């Protein structure tokens, strides 16, 4: 006999409610947050998700040839003064990092004689060109030059 005979029905209802609610709680815990802000999300996309447009890559190619090819060469192979921007060494050095890191590196260190003179949009367009040149697929939407947007895109060398 229960020490609380009057509350037997309440205990049974509570136990039944807990059993029914447990899968719901587990599902909520496993699901991504519904109100996640851009600053809280990380790396939801990769360079294989068509994160730039062909038109943007075209602008980036023009900018690259005007501002970068002098040191990095038109073939992006690099030279005595500058590293390569294509090939296995380039790809492996950026693999797993965010496009925000690549953007920041270019924006703050290029050109080496006067770093920081290129606009964020110029750098983003050049990144679109680098991605296109290295075989990543273009899409319908341009790569956005905001840090939050770039922070959510990982440079991944192997296709999914």
Where are these regions (language model features)?
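Signal peptide processing junction and immediate N-terminal pro/mature segment
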Residues: 24-40
